[in-house]
Amino acid sequence: MANEKRCAIYNRYSVNAPQILDKKRDELISYCENDLGIPNHELFEEVGSVLEEREVFDQMMARIEQNEFSDVLVCHIDRIYKPGYDPEKLAEYVDRIRAKAVIHTVE
């Protein structure tokens, strides 16, 4: 990756609230472009429960670890991994991301 910033935007909500995905998508893109000043971004979205496989998230993580992104934006840190489900796993993912990129949250 050159010196240009590139942000991975991760947007995920439960199957019980898929309509929130659209609203949060607009909020995340606006925050990335206007507040962070990073117009170069890629959106990763999925709807699912905490127990499901997260194929899109796994693809994003692989690309973060290949240094494709300088920044990662999520609505809230628990979008990375549900802390109530496994706080150690959340910490592991956060550490893996922070080793390669800066994590930003809107909330």
List each language-model region with its residue ranges.
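Short, structured surface patches at the beginning of a domain
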Residues: M1-E107
